């Protein structure tokens, strides 16, 4: 056995025996070389192997720390099966790791905290963002990346600022992201809806809208649409981009669930764009936690200066502490490690949901995608409000779809499903209860 392997095993055993706690700093390389009577390069080899195994992580100019590997079970405080909540499971996040990054961020950026930042965001985070975005097949220059206070802020700025095509009307899928629907209604923005279903959108209708209306941009979720859970195929993406280029319409791509993609061959719309007509939005609210309030926006060159000006008048800069902590979290490799682990957890839940739908609700239409969001298309004779109320009384929580539509748009009979906050063993039980309720004539008109 080589010397570095002996050191690796020693430290690994101490971590597994909890002699070294999650978040605890390892002795310095110099101290370890003295402890094990070996060269610093031997210690570095052992530490690199521990890092490769995701047992420790490095923070520049600080040292090596033990990764928090705990994924505690959620306390069973309720008997409800919650298909309504879309926020991530709070107990799954390794708080100790991120808390350490927060503390380190305050130490590292003491002076910067007393100055206003830049409209684009913390430069060191933007550099990490550029490298991270490349793993999603988003290749761009750092000058076109903005750190925003969540995707919601990016959407607000894009909705209010003028575009180079000098148009005003926004096109949105129906149904769509409920908070953006609220924003459009509140500000009374000119808007048109296009129906999206399990089968996607009608491309002929899309062309007709692009051709006959002054469409500023088309807001879309090509991957794992909220609330439907559906995704566009490659041919649909290419067709949408072709029409956008022909009619000079920008595409706002909300890729909020990119981190949960299990198929490495699926790329975002942005990666197919050759005419600089796609604005890419990346969120951390699902993969980490909504309270972080950090998102990335990638702008085409023509829109970059104006977006920067509008963002500066909105908040000058997003939270410096959150930005600095996220930079360290990404740079240390902890984000990639956590992303791989938690996306696998949600994929397992989504697979159980898909199997349960096929087993108990096969007579209804639902998407085939393995996603934490899904839905069931119900017959028109189903009274959706009565059905939801009935299921709530039987401890199955569901949310009406009304908020995902614009005013005046005929709502589909769609039952939204989200498994973000349901334990695996409860998913099929919940679907069975829905199937039983649909067999009850009291839930029909």
Placement of each model-derived feature along the sequence:
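Conserved core of the PLP fold type I
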Residues: 112-247, 259-260, 265-272, 346, ...
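N-terminal basic, amphipathic alpha-helical segments
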Residues: 1-105, 111-117, 125, 130-131, ...
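PLP-dependent aminotransferase class I/II
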Residues: 279-359, 364-366
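Hydrophobic residues in beta-strands of the RecA-like P-loop NTPase core, especially within AAA+ ATPase
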Residues: 172, 252-253
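Residue-level marker for buried hydrophobic side chains located in beta-strands
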Residues: 83, 251-252
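Short, conserved active-site loop motifs that form the nucleotide-linked donor/cofactor pocket
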Residues: 145, 249, 278, 363, ...
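Short, solvent-exposed loop/turn elements at beta->coil junctions and helix N-caps
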Residues: 284, 402-406
